[in-house]
Amino acid sequence: MLRIKRIYEPPSKEDGHRILVDRVWPRGFTKEEACVDEWRKDLAPSDSLRKWFGHDPKKWEEFRERYRRQLQKESKWSDLMAIAERAKRENVTLVFSAKDEKHNQAVALKEVIESLRPRGTEEE
């Protein structure tokens, strides 16, 4: 199962494999405190896209599309497919630090990863 979680929420066993998807390391956390298994800053939005978006909900739809195009352009599909495959076998949690829990890169990235799953593998 693929899920998302703010880094400021306590880690739990249910998180499974935790992947930090922020380009910048979250303030106030050591690597031990973050309890992440991977830091995939290469999957985060570019600095220019992140700054343009600025977590403005009015820009959300366009941000999602630009971010998807960025991932395609940077040939990240195989990396995202690997995450989707892992999420079929175990819990995978995309960890983020944004305050807005509805309009952030982890939400958009989860949507992209879920769209890559072959039909018939959706969770019930």
Please give the residue ranges for each predicted region.
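Residues lining hydrophobic/aromatic ligand-binding pockets adjacent to catalytic sites
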Residues: 1-124
